[in-house]
Amino acid sequence: MQFYIMSFLSPQDLCQLGSTCQYWHTVVRDPVLWRYFLLRDLPSWSFIDHNSMPDVEKISKPLGGLDDDTMHDYMQEYLKSCPGCRRRLKPYRRGYAAVTSFLHSLVINTEPRLAMFGPGLEQLEVSLVRKMMHSPDVIPVAGFPQRQINGIGSGISFMLNNKQRFNILTLYSTTSKERERARVEQNNAPNKMFLQEGDVAAECPTMSYRIIPQVQEVCRVVDGFIYVANAEAGRSHEREEEFAQIQAMTASDLGSSNRPVLVLSCVSRAGTRRIPCVYMAHELHLNRLPRPWLVQDAEAETLNGLLNGIEWILEESGINV
């Protein structure tokens, strides 16, 4: 009966109840209860990052297959991962981080540059890039820089919060005509940015790619990466291939291993059935990336979630926003 009643309380209420006495401190840590909260709530979370990603495989296992030590991790797993709990526990920006950002602004006198790529740019009914370029009330266009990259261009500069300029270099897999044909037919367009390596004909081929020289030049000069993932649940996805391409773009021989990766888990519009961001991070094997990353839910039509993601990647790049 206690368990049934506690299941109607919020996790925050349970934590307060647990602070009243030793008895409730023990009772509210019931692993079955916190596993229930995890399975119930994580599909509704709008972002997850490299510091808060829960162990999806452990959560999905039957309780009978877990030992006692593992069982007691569920409460900590929830508090670490839940966006609401993390906002309450988030410390103030530490002094040295602010100083680092200030020094970064003195040394780097050009606007930060971000490379944006991924199937969500090409497969969705609503174009994220087109919406960004025509939504001055959300993210105004600030200009087109003169710095050119051969075969790529200069990208587009935007303004965040009316004070911080940043530049996005959008990398498409192929021509606009081929992308549109693939979108209508719900096929994957041939990706001309990547060259597959290894034995493709092997019985168990491993996905491995290298990127073409023009894109390599982009990867060497950018401060971070935005990967636009198709989060719509109604079609098949090639997540292993996507992860291999993310690895190729962020390879350590092309630049610093500290450059962050923002994954915009994107759908066309509100009401579209989406893959939860926690499952997106799990499917893309982001825990295997040796760099900061964030998965942020986003909508192309309204640009919901976009600014949150941009703020995160700029802060991770050393920009005080």
Spans of model-derived segments:
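Skp1-binding F-box subdomain of Cullin-RING ligase substrate receptors
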Residues: Q2-N109, A115
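Glycine-rich phosphate-binding P-loop
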Residues: S105-A142
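Active-site-adjacent loop/helix micro-motif of nuclease/hydrolase catalytic cores
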Residues: E125, K177-E185, M207, G234-A244, ...
